[in-house]
A protein has these predicted regions:
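Aromatic/His-enriched, Gly/Pro-containing loop or helix-boundary segments
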Residues: 1-4, 55, 63, 146
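Internal alpha-helical transmembrane segments
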Residues: 2-30, 133-139, 173-175, 191-199
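Juxtamembrane extramembrane loops of integral membrane proteins
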Residues: 13, 23-106
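Soluble non-transmembrane domains of integral membrane proteins
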Residues: 70, 74-303
Length: 303
């Protein structure tokens, strides 16, 4: 009887050790990795913060679209426009999908930032040098060349600051849902600068949620082959941050997803946060060195 008790005690102790190693030791490793990642994050620049006090005006979507100059885009699947104020993609409608079977209205996904249903995508460069002006959400870009974006004709936007730096965006569109954005800075001075590229998806409010068990609606990413799914209410309470070398990030609905693919072969930090608006953001962690009388360029993709 005593030997049976000893065997049982050994078996129980072994089970406790195995369970501890399975469920607690990896968590400790993960915590250590998060501490290291967070330390690295603190050393890098950060993308522009959301305008927390921006007023959401009570106007219609159509009226909001008239408040800034725009450049149209269209292919066989989507139609919309890019605001020249901020160079944001904030107007997109699906040509082949109806709101309901008994109506002719098409599904609209994106909307201007200054309405309640605001949902948009923007990108650019930032620098830790506070004396250098960079384009922001209020910058008005100029159109060079083509004045309509199609799958056969890309567009180019430009803006020049007072320090002799010219910022360019070349935007192309395939015949499906893929935008490719080539961002470039041309330095016409002898000065040297460091820049970080970023992209972000901004959504003003939580859409109607289906809340189906196997369906994720919220902020989503695949970072270094790890799937990340964060609900809206989770992000309202806690910010998510992770450094990765490859992947995508975005916001998903029942039927639709809006996503960013950061530049290849560069490490980037992904952030999901909420500051009166939801944001899915990436920023490169290593600076691009812009030498005098030279240029730098990076490419990101939007789906």
């Amino acid at each position: 009887m005593e030997s049976k008790n000893v065997i049982a005690a050994i078996a129980l102790s072994t089970a406790v050790i195995v369970l501890y190693s399975l469920f607690f030791l990896p968590e400790q490793k993960s915590n250590n990795q998060n501490i290291a990642d967070n330390a690295k994050v603190e050393q890098s620049s950060d993308a522009p913060s959301l305008e927390q006090k921006e007023t959401l005006v009570s106007i219609s979507r159509d009226e909001a679209l008239t408040q800034s100059e725009r450049i149209q885009f269209e292919n066989n699947n989507i139609i919309g426009s890019i605001s020249l104020k901020g160079a944001s993609i904030d107007d997109l409608t699906f040509k082949k999908y109806k709101v309901s079977l008994d109506k002719e209205d098409r599904v609209t996904l994106l909307g201007p930032r200054n309405i309640k249903e605001g949902y948009l995508i923007e990108s650019g460069f930032v620098t830790s040098d506070k004396n250098v002006d960079v384009p922001n959400s209020k910058t008005v870009w100029l159109v060079e060349g083509n004045n309509k974006l199609t799958n056969e004709s890309p567009i180019k936007l430009s803006w020049t600051n007072n320090q002799g730096l010219k910022f360019e965006k070349e935007i192309s569109l395939d015949d499906e849902y893929l935008f490719t954005v080539k961002q470039k800075i041309i330095n016409k001075t002898n000065n040297k600068y460091d820049f970080y590229s970023y992209g972000q998806i901004i959504r003003n409010e939580i859409p109607e949620i289906i809340d189906f068990l196997i369906l994720h609606e919220g902020l989503i990413a695949t970072l270094d082959d790890e799937l990340i799914e964060e609900d809206y209410d989770d992000i309202q309470e806690n910010k998510f941050t992770k450094i990765a070398k490859k992947g995508f990030l975005g916001i998903s609905d029942k039927y639709w997803i809006t996503s960013l693919i950061p530049p290849k072969s560069t490490e980037f930090k992904t952030t999901f946060d909420y500051k009166n608006k939801f944001r899915a953001n990436f920023i490169t962690t290593d600076p691009l060195e812009l030498n005098g009388n030279s240029s730098i360029e990076e490419e990101l993709k939007i789906i």
